[in-house]
Amino acid sequence: MKTFVIGIGGVTNGGKTTLAKNLQKRLPNCSVISQDDFFKPESEIDIDENGFLQYDVLEALNMEKMMSAVSCWMENPGSSAGPAALESAQGVPILIIEGFLLFNYKPLDTIWNRSYFLTVPYEECKRRRSTRVYEPPDPPGYFDGHVWPMYLKHRQEMNSITWDIVYLDGTRSEEDLFSQVYEDVKQELEKQNGL
């Protein structure tokens, strides 16, 4: 069975989850897997020399468990969407995987039909992060001492990627971002279906 897998990566608080949920509402036969659902327990998270918990690294995530969820979906795509979705005009099962380190994890490299990466400038990212509540809470200096430097490091690693990633300005409106990605996905699905 044909499937269509979308990766939505990007900076923390860049709009990944919002975009994924908006797409899921409009795309038939669509499921979402969020990388944030696969964080290891706090007791298993490393602490750096500054005392910061190292959440913004692949080692903080149970990627094997996430890959298992992806594999389960691939083996039985569309099962979570229900029978009505399977009968839709665009019956290709769609999986959206969203997270901050998707494109830095090699086992996912060959899965993407479309890849998107949301960027947000430093000041806006810091402002957005300050409005969110995390468990455990961000200690003072965490954004500048860990979160942003890790984003820059992982973003630099992405320079070696050989497949196409569409970079999106995360400061654009939710509606604009949705419209751009939705239209792009529709065109790609039509190409895949030979329409």
From Swiss-Prot:
User: Is this entry keyworded Transferase?
Assistant: yes
Question: Which pathway is this protein engaged in?
Answer: Cofactor biosynthesis; NAD(+) biosynthesis
Q: Which gene encodes it?
A: Nmrk1
Specify the species. Rattus norvegicus (Rat)
Which is an annotated Pfam family here? AAA_18
Q: Which UniProt keywords apply?
A: ATP-binding, Kinase, Magnesium, Metal-binding, Nucleotide-binding, Pyridine nucleotide biosynthesis, Transferase
Q: For Mg(2+), which residues are the binding ones?
A: T17, D36
What's a single GO CC term here? cytoplasm
Q: Which domain of life is it from?
A: Eukaryota
Q: Which SUPFAM superfamilies match?
A: P-loop containing nucleoside triphosphate hydrolases (SSF52540)
Q: List the disulfide bonds.
A: none
Q: Which reaction does it catalyse?
A: beta-nicotinamide D-riboside + ATP = beta-nicotinamide D-ribonucleotide + ADP + H(+); beta-D-ribosylnicotinate + ATP = nicotinate beta-D-ribonucleotide + ADP + H(+)
Q: Where does ATP bind?
A: 10-18, 128, 132-134, 172-174
Q: What does this protein do?
A: Catalyzes the phosphorylation of nicotinamide riboside (NR) and nicotinic acid riboside (NaR) to form nicotinamide mononucleotide (NMN) and nicotinic acid mononucleotide (NaMN).
Instruction: List, in alphabetical order, the Gene Ontology terms for molecular function in this entry.
Output: ATP binding; metal ion binding; nicotinate riboside kinase activity; ribosylnicotinamide kinase activity; ribosylnicotinate kinase activity
| Listed EC numbers | 2.7.1.22, 2.7.1.173
- What is the name of the protein in this document? Nicotinamide riboside kinase 1
Q: What enzyme class is recorded for this protein?
A: transferase
Where, in this chain's numbering, is substrate bound? D36, D37, F38, F39, Y55, D56, R129, Y134, E135
